[in-house]
Regions:
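Beta/coil-rich, acidic/histidine-enriched accessory regions frequently appended to metallopeptidases
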Residues: 30-33, 38-41, 208, 235-238, ...
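Active-site-proximal alpha-helical
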Residues: 167-168, 172-182, 190-259
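Short loop/turn segments that connect beta-strands within beta-propeller blades
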Residues: 328-331, 382-386, 429-433, 478-482, ...
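Interface/linker segment at the passenger-translocator junction
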Residues: 567-647, 654-659, 706, 863
Length: 934
């Protein structure tokens, strides 16, 4: 079983040094560790907090929080933890995205996670104490749930069991972490109910993993707690042993099965939300929707264009990437924007934040922030020339947010999260690039907005919130004196202030009436501007001062609306009295000496153990073996052990034993791997029998240049023995000692959809020599090149192109293969071989059916998606000797159909017509393929 085991071994030895690329070797994006950390462990009574935070403020807030939550949940879950709870804390979200606890890439929208294997909690700070508190409590619910299920099943001698459905686990975490449901959560559920998108429990898999699933799950758990008691949620876990079916566990606990629970919840939701809907209005009755259905637009801003027209810019999603678009209002009042800035294609503009940061447009200049490798960069962008005017990165400032330009165009104020995790305000002088700090305290300051006619800014802050960290208020700062004055206050959240063009009033968002709506603050009072059924966010004045833009959530989408300013005198409200600037909570009163702090020490634990049997039908070989993966708690140090056998029959399993062990260090920007291996009894198809024994070691380096690019180097030393007809006849040497050095470059900025890439491109090039130290003819050189391009031609229609060439020179008999569904389709698997191969693939992929529901006597089966393909392949192989085995150019025309099962491999059938590029065979071939499309 040559290729299978060699691939597994090579991936185990080298791919660990390639970050997230290990899942798609040799391609894949990179998880870059931009800076090594000096990790320490702070120990409370029950929790170990792993951190590196240079500022103790966040740790002194977090430590009592997690300890108090631990004790609270111990009572809630009726659970006595028998181990210390590991809690890994990251000072910023960008640091969190570099974690190696999970091998996969982490998006900007992941607030934290709890891993199933070791029960580790990983949480970042994002500048908000309220968010940190919520996420920490949310993830600790997961840890307690996992421990509770383990204890319940272990006490009854049951060691294999399933997990609750995701809507239940995430809903429980939201429900127990922060009750009652937030206005934003209510907004999502109310919109779903209004638009018939509140899924029944047997169909909630359609929104698996989405934010809507979290919020609907929370609403269901709130219904269970309200009708059956809060303790019923825990009793469901305590009765987990009673049945393997979740519906039966519900029946055994609260007396209703899943269908009865669903029926009760749907009625409960209608009774709860329908009356409130009568008190609200549809956004379309108040303003004009500017964006089409089925789209996402957020953070709108408006300015005067070069010809006096009104231009609108907004953040949107195009083809899976977050972009900034811009365009004028049409004479008919519509808006048809074009893409202005695209993120997600290079390290320079790695990603554009879709929610956390606003954009501003002033004439031809667009102001925004985007991630640039390790931290954010502030950009000035020309809208007319579609290019960068200027940009800045600041030492010590990791994440920038909501830049706002002064009226004279000489200064920019923005909020930023420092490397130590706190969010403050900063002032940039554009003439000389001088940066001034405006605030330095324990509070969070965000959403700044510059008065167009004065050196005054508005911003949102949690100062004065007391112990209710969900409260935020609007404050005003006079830049000349740095004096901070509260403007709006009360027991609710006020956010996103936006000055009017005359600088005398401002819009803001408030949930004071239970729904996030737009309000206008005037010198003489406050006027409510919207009263929509769902909710609004991020208002922005139009240049005329008589209208404003806002994002409205409806039908599960964010849309940009234009609303008229309302100024009715009878609707005037007095401004609510602002709170004093008291210190929230009592963070400064925590005694650091009450906790024990120790340096972090690397200790390995098992992450994965597996075994299996594999058969290579093309060679008739049998392989069986196992794998063990050990990592430290942070995932930075990994040991991978592989053992098994490749044999031609079961009688020689022990004789042909194989083993490899590798160590990978991922704790720094430069990753490295060490490996040792003993590989025995490979069989190849160059001769009737080709056995190889290889024993040696390897060393590999991987240096990511960005999320999308990396360079790699590796060296392998091995003792090799070949047993085949040529060596047995004395025509070639049998043994030698060789060394190889390879250099590689990889780029991958593709975006994936179900079954394969959607758009972007990727390439991989590697090459290097193998030296025979004993001069016995095993010298060789290798060069491989693989480039792939994906072009989106329409909605879910992709043109995929690939060119691969593999070349070997020298005395060794290394060859490459073509043929089969992975390479040259329409021909038997590995039909052609050579020391040089060329392969072209072109394929048009398109949707066939979005879903197929088959009703059977035992229940319905839903198959989510069918896709089709038209393809043409061409390939050629050649050898330096035995030229009779060379092939002319051969090709294949074909059609394919595949079943997509989410992110699982596709099940695909191909009908092929081989060709010599002159004639086409009349008889078609048939192929079955299970895997991912190239």
């Amino acid at each position: 079983m040559p290729r299978l085991f060699r691939f597994i071994l090579f991936a185990a030895i080298f791919c660990g040094a390639a970050g997230s690329a290990r899942a798609q070797y040799p391609f894949g994006k990179n998880k870059v560790i931009y800076q090594g950390r000096n990790w320490r462990v702070l120990q409370t009574e029950h929790v170990d907090i792993y951190h590196y935070a240079p500022d103790s403020t966040l740790i002194l807030y977090l430590a009592p929080l997690v300890e108090q939550t631990f004790q609270e949940y111990s009572e809630t879950f009726h659970l006595d933890f028998k181990r210390r709870l590991p809690f890994v804390f990251y000072a910023t979200h960008y640091d969190f995205q570099q974690t190696n606890i999970l091998p996969s890439l982490i998006s900007e929208y992941t607030g934290g996670f709890t891993d199933l294997m070791k029960g580790r909690i990983a949480v970042p700070a994002n500048g908000s104490y309220a968010n940190l508190r919520h996420v920490a409590r949310h993830e600790m619910v997961h840890a307690f749930m996992l421990e509770k299920l383990h204890r319940v099943m272990d006490d009854r001698g049951k060691f294999t069991y399933g997990q609750p459905p995701l809507w239940f686990t995430e809903g429980m975490a939201e429900y127990l972490a922060d009750s009652p449901q937030s206005p934003q959560g209510e907004m999502f559920v109310r919109d779903a109910l209004l638009n018939s998108r509140l899924y029944h429990l047997d169909e909630i898999w359609r929104i698996e993993g989405s934010y809507m699933m979290y919020k609907q799950g929370e609403a269901i758990l709130n219904y269970i707690g309200t009708n059956y008691g809060k303790d019923a949620v825990i009793r469901i876990l305590e009765n987990w042993w009673t049945a393997s079916d979740f519906s039966l566990v519900l029946k055994n606990t609260i007396g209703v099965d899943m269908f009865e629970l669903d029926d009760g919840f749907q009625k409960y939701a209608r009774r709860r939300y329908y009356p409130s809907m009568l008190e609200h209005e549809f956004a379309s009755d108040l303003g004009k929707q500017l964006t089409p259905d089925g789209s996402f637009y957020n953070r709108p801003t408006a300015t005067i264009g070069p010809e006096g027209e009104t231009d609108i810019c907004a953040v949107t999603a195009r083809d899976g990437r977050v972009v900034i678009c811009s365009g004028p209002r049409t004479e008919e009042g519509g808006w048809h924007p074009d893409v202005l800035v695209t993120g997600g294609r290079s390290g320079r503009l790695e990603s554009i934040p879709a929610f956390r940061s606003k954009i501003e447009a002033h004439g031809d200049t667009l102001i925004f922030v985007a991630k640039n490798n390790a931290r954010d960069r502030l950009y000035l962008w020309s809208r007319s020339h579609h290019k960068e005017i200027a940009s800045w990165r600041f030492d010590g400032l990791t994440m920038l947010q909501s830049p706002t330009l002064s009226g004279d165009g000489r200064r920019i104020v923005f909020s930023a999260i420092e490397a130590r995790g706190r969010m403050d305000l900063f002032l940039l002088h554009l003439e000389d690039g001088k940066l001034e700090r405006l605030t330095e305290d324990g509070y969070s300051e965000e959403d700044p907005d510059y008065n167009p006619h004065a050196d005054v800014i508005l911003f949102t802050s949690d100062r004065g919130a007391g112990e209710d960290l969900n409260r935020t208020h609007i404050y005003e700062m006079v830049l000349a004196t740095r004096e901070i004055v509260p403007v709006e206050g009360g027991p609710f959240a006020d956010t996103n202030p936006d000055w009017s063009p005359d600088g005398k009033s401002f819009l803001f968002i408030s949930d004071r009436d239970g729904t996030p709506d737009v309000y206008l603050h005037r010198p003489d009072g406050v006027v409510r501007q919207t009263n929509v059924t769902t909710g609004c966010s991020v208002p922005a004045f139009m240049p005329d001062g008589e209208h404003f833009l806002a994002s409205v959530y409806e039908r599960g989408e964010f849309h940009t609306y234009e609303f008229p300013i309302r100024n009715p005198a009878h609707s005037l409200r007095a401004p609510l009295p602002p709170d004093t600037l008291q210190v929230p909570w009592s963070r400064a009163d925590v005694d650091p000496s009450s906790f024990v702090t120790k340096p972090y020490r690397t200790k390995f634990g098992i992450d994965f153990v597996g075994a299996g049997v594999a058969i290579d039908p093309s060679a008739g070989d049998i392989g069986n073996g196992g794998q063990m993966v050990l990592t430290d708690l942070l995932g930075n140090h990994q040991i991978n052990i592989i053992f098994g056998t490749t044999t031609e029959d079961f009688s020689s399993v022990l004789k042909d034993f194989n083993a490899a062990v590798s160590y990978t260090n991922l704790s720094h920007h430069l990753n490295y791997s060490l490996a040792a291996f003993h590989l025995n009894s490979f069989t190849d198809r160059v001769f009737l029998s080709n056995q190889e024994k290889r024993t040696g070691g390897a060393f590999a380096l991987s240096y990511p240049l960005s999320k999308f690019d990396r360079i790699e180097a590796s060296t392998v030393f091995r003792q090799i023995e070949k047993i085949n007809p040529a060596t047995l006849a004395g025509l070639r040497q049998r043994e030698s000692i060789t060394g190889s050095v390879y250099l590689s470059a990889v780029r991958d900025n593709t975006l994936w959809t179900y079954g394969g890439p959607l758009l972007g491109w990727r390439f991989y090039v590697t090459g290097g020599p193998t030296v025979d130290f004993l001069g016995r003819g095993f010298d060789s050189s290798l060069l491989q090149f693989d480039v792939r391009r994906y072009v989106k031609l329409g909605p879910r229609v992709t043109l995929a192109m690939r060119y691969v060439t593999r070349n070997a020179w020298g005395g060794d008999d290394l060859v490459f293969y073509l043929g089969g569904p992975w390479t040259l389709r329409g021909y038997p698997y590995n039909e052609f071989l050579g020391r040089t191969t060329h392969l072209f693939n072109t394929e048009l992929r398109f949707p066939l059916l979005d879903g197929l529901r088959i009703v059977l006597p035992f229940g319905p089966i839903e198959l989510p998606m069918f896709r089709g393909a038209l393809f043409f392949d061409a390939g050629r192989t050649s050898r330096n000797t035995f030229s009779v085995l060379d092939t002319d150019w051969l090709g294949t025309l074909g059609v394919g159909a595949e079943l997509n099962l989410g992110y699982a491999p596709v099940i695909r059938v191909n009908f092929t017509w081989p060709t010599d590029l002159v004639t086409i065979k009349k008889d078609s071939g048939f192929e079955l393929f299970i895997g991912y499309n190239y």
